[in-house]
Structures are given as structure tokens and as C-alpha cells.
Amino acid sequence: MVVELKNIEKIYENGFHALKGVNLELKKGDILGVIGYSGAGKSTLIRLINCLERPSSGEVLVNGVNLLNLKPKELQKARQKIGMIFQHFNLLSAKNVFENVAFALEIARWEKTKIKSRVHELLELVGLEDKVHFYPKQLSGGQKQRVAIARSLANCPNLLLCDEATSALDSKTTHSILTLLSGIQKKFDLSIVFITHQIEVVKELCNQMCVISSGEIVERGSVEEIFANPKHAVTKELLGIKNEHADQKSQDIYRIVFLGEHLDEPIISNLIRRFKIDVSIISGNIEELTTKDIGYLVVRFLGSVAEIQRALEYLNALGLQVEKLKD
């Protein structure tokens, strides 16, 4: 495991219980989206991973080492394998792009002869080789975040922490940053923890996700699994799943989830031909995830109880998720 959080509790001096019994693992090469509402404990969680904050109790293991047991110099060395980017970039306004990236190498005591080539390599990686002498005030928000990404990769980390790294950006720039991070992850086989309140970020970038609410992890799994079958009420809210059809007169209203292999199949047509029922489609949409697409239909079944039951058994036999929206 690249990251292991064990029985983490975080209680501030004012008595606020920010994290409660948190256990979390991150495997090599995984991109974990941590999502939740404001104040849920997301930023506290990510700051514990590199010990910017220390837990009240529990263990923080990164690359197999409990960071809480390290002396200051040992912790500083361990942090070189942990890159971090922030919502507001945290660039030094008095230094140009080259100097901002070089600063991370200087702190790590790189040889001066190697710093120049490494900085140019990083700036080429993030598409800013033509902005070497620009200062932060001359850059757009997306360009500033690219500088921050280059700086975070300076010491060749195997773990990248992203704290709301796209929430200050517009949707087009967010997409470009996520595309960049995805390419970097594949190139260097990085593990990434991405804190966000934007469900679109999880859909576009992550293969794993966890949902945090009031300091507790309430749901954890692959993005595909959770989008297909969310269990916790907070997860359903974040995914935009609401029982908006509760006022419909018919009781036989269902939500059907189609995974990638079923999206192109005429399942509803087959259902009508096989069974003595009519199917009214109320709503539908498709979510494009990093692993596969997932489709959703909200339908009303019209027919006898026995025929509707047979139709439901048929859908279940196909491996589809079927949820009754009204009893």
C-alpha cells in the first residue's frame, strides 16, 4: 500500500471532532477521489497524509513507514516522495516560473548543475516551456496550477495529493488540468489522492472514490461500483440521485442501471416483447466514467403483478441494478 490510515481521530483544541475512526488504503497506481460537502473533513484528511497536521490518535503510513514516528529530518526526506498541489496554487509571487519550480529542488539540496535541466524537463511536461521567465501575476489560473504541478513533481514523488486543485478554475481549464494529471499518472505510475466537492472531477479522473460526511467515511469503493449502486444518503445526494418521482400515482416505478456492456442492447424492447407489460420511460441519462460508461433509466411498469415480477427477475438475471423508487 502507498497510503494506509489506521483508526484516525482528529480532535481540535476547541473540541471539534474533525475525523472519526477513519481507515483508508491507497494502492499503487490508484486515483482516489475523496468527495464530500464543505466542512466534512476532506482537507483535514489530506493534510494528515503528509503530516501537515497530526492526528489525535491513529497511524499514518506512507510507503510502509509510519510518518508519526519520524524525526523532523526523516519526515522532511519522506515528504520528498509526496507531492502536493492546492486550490490557490501557493506560488511565490516574487519568483518567476523557473524559480518557483527550482525552489523545491533547492530545498531538497539538488546539485545546481542538475536543477536547470530538471526544471526545463518539468516545464515541458506541463506545457509551460515558453513561460520560463513569466511571473505568477502574468499567468492564468490554469497556468499557475500547471506550475504548481511541475513543482510538486520536482523530487520524483510516487504519491500526489491534490486539495481542491480545480475548484478555482473554470470548466474548460479544469478539464485540461485533469487531462494533464491523468497523463502524468500513467507516465509515472503515480498514486493520487484528489480532494474535491465536484462530482465531475471524480467521474473524469478517478478509478476509486470515498465519500466523507461529518468526519466519517460513509462509502468507499470503485467509482464504477458506487455510481452503479450508491448506498448512503449523502452519496446519493452528491451523485444527484433523488426520488423526484415519489408523487407519481403508479407504485411500479424503478431505476435501472445499465453498465457498459448493456448500453447498446435493446433491453427495454426485449422486455416488452417477452412479457405482458408496457414500459413508460420517465427519464434517463448516461455517465461517462474513466473505466466504463453507466446508463440510468427511470421507468414505470404497467401490467399484472406477476408479469412485472417476471420482468424484474429477467433484469436481475442480466446483472442489471434495479431499484424500486416507490413502494
From Swiss-Prot:
Gene Ontology MF term list: ABC-type D-methionine transporter activity; ATP binding; ATP hydrolysis activity
Topology in the lipid bilayer: Peripheral membrane protein
SUPFAM superfamilies reported in the protein's UniProt record: ACT-like, P-loop containing nucleoside triphosphate hydrolases
UniProt keyword Translocase present: yes
Location of the protein in the cell: Cell inner membrane
Alphabetical list of CDD domains matching this protein: ABC_MetN_methionine_transporter
Main location: membrane
The entry's keywords: Amino-acid transport, ATP-binding, Cell inner membrane, Cell membrane, Membrane, Nucleotide-binding, Translocase, Transport
Statement: the UniProt record of this protein carries the keyword Protease: no
EC number(s) given by UniProt: 7.4.2.11
InterPro entries the record matches: AAA+_ATPase (IPR003593), ABC_transporter-like_ATP-bd (IPR003439), ABC_transporter-like_CS (IPR017871), ACT-like_dom_sf (IPR045865), MetN_ABC (IPR041701), MetN_ABC_transporter-like (IPR050086), NIL_domain (IPR018449), P-loop_NTPase (IPR027417)
Biological function: Part of the ABC transporter complex MetNIQ involved in methionine import. Responsible for energy coupling to the transport system.
PANTHER family: AMINO ACID IMPORT ATP-BINDING PROTEIN, METHIONINE IMPORT ATP-BINDING PROTEIN METN
Family: Belongs to the ABC transporter superfamily. Methionine importer (TC 3.A.1.24) family.
Protein name: Methionine import ATP-binding protein MetN
Protein source organism: Helicobacter pylori (strain J99 / ATCC 700824)
